[in-house]
Regions:
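Flexible loop/turn segments at secondary-structure boundaries
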Residues: 61-62, 145, 217-218
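Short glycine-/acidic-enriched loop or helix-start segments at secondary-structure transitions
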Residues: 65, 147-149, 220
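Structural signal for hydrophobic packing residues in well-ordered secondary-structure cores
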Residues: 3-14, 102, 106, 152, ...
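Internal helical hairpin/lid segments
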Residues: 217-233
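N-terminal Rossmann-like NAD(P)+-binding subdomain of aldehyde/semialdehyde dehydrogenases
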Residues: 1-51
């Protein structure tokens, strides 16, 4: 119920609706979407959360702190989510929506096991949280992940890390040759959102584009990059 109400709050709020990443999160945690997720992972065996999960959210991906928090809640954990100080201002509308829903009396139990914090680069603070957690979720570059993994956790604790990852895209020359200008523009808009909004730093942002020479007109490649340039202008 909490996440479904958060979804509704995000999708009807003008400030969060204007932010594509926040709106996408609101759409992702709709009740129907979560029920489908629960059905996919259904088990006849009883399952419990790990306990206290400490999340280090990345600085380069908007709204990702909300996804990692949501997964932590769905897994049955209490959660401490550290936001980068570089993200706090940009995430203000989504944070405000989250606070409004958490403050509702019916969600007191969720509020009691949810903390969102921010602090500057301070290994001593991070190490203190690591020493107290039952699960650690680390998002960041290889160096950040290695530094955090060197910080001791309780013997029973588990961790999940998301270090540097690289993606590429493969485009069909034949398929791109068949696109109308409108279809090409719509696809370029989506490519721009996936790639340039995060300066190619997201795990799914392609660092390399390969063209499959499967027919069609090679000139479609130039038309494609012109459409992408128009989106970036």
């Amino acid at each position: 119920d909490f996440l479904a109400e958060l979804s509704a709050e995000v999708l009807r709020g003008p400030d969060t609706r204007r932010q594509e990443a926040s709106a996408a999160f609101g759409f992702w945690c709709r009740r129907a979407r979560l029920e489908a997720l629960a059905a996919r992972h259904a088990s006849p065996l009883p399952r419990l959360g790990r306990g206290l999960a400490f999340h280090l959210a990345p600085a380069n991906v908007p709204a990702l702190f909300a996804y990692t928090l949501a997964i932590g809640l769905l897994a049955g954990n209490a959660n401490v989510v550290r936001l980068s100080s570089r993200r706090v201002e940009g995430e203000a509308p989504l944070l405000a929506a989250l606070r409004r829903v958490l403050e509702r009396p019916e969600h007191a139990a969720v509020r009691a096991r949810t903390s969102l914090i921010t602090y500057g680069r301070d290994d001593a603070v991070t190490a203190d949280y690591c020493a107290r957690c039952d699960a650690r979720i680390v998002w960041g570059g290889d160096a950040t992940v290695a530094a955090v993994r060197a910080m001791p956790m309780p013997p029973h604790a588990v961790e999940l890390c998301f270090p540097d990852r690289w993606s590429l895209a493969v485009f069909s020359q034949r398929a791109f040759s068949a696109l109308t200008p409108e279809e090409r523009g719509a696809l370029a808009h989506r490519f721009y959102n996936d790639t340039y909004q995060m300066d190619q730093n997201a795990c799914s942002s392609p660092q390399l584009v390969l063209w499959l020479e499967d027919g069609g007109d090679p000139a479609c490649r130039g038309r494609w990059w012109e459409a992408v340039a128009a989106e970036a202008a």
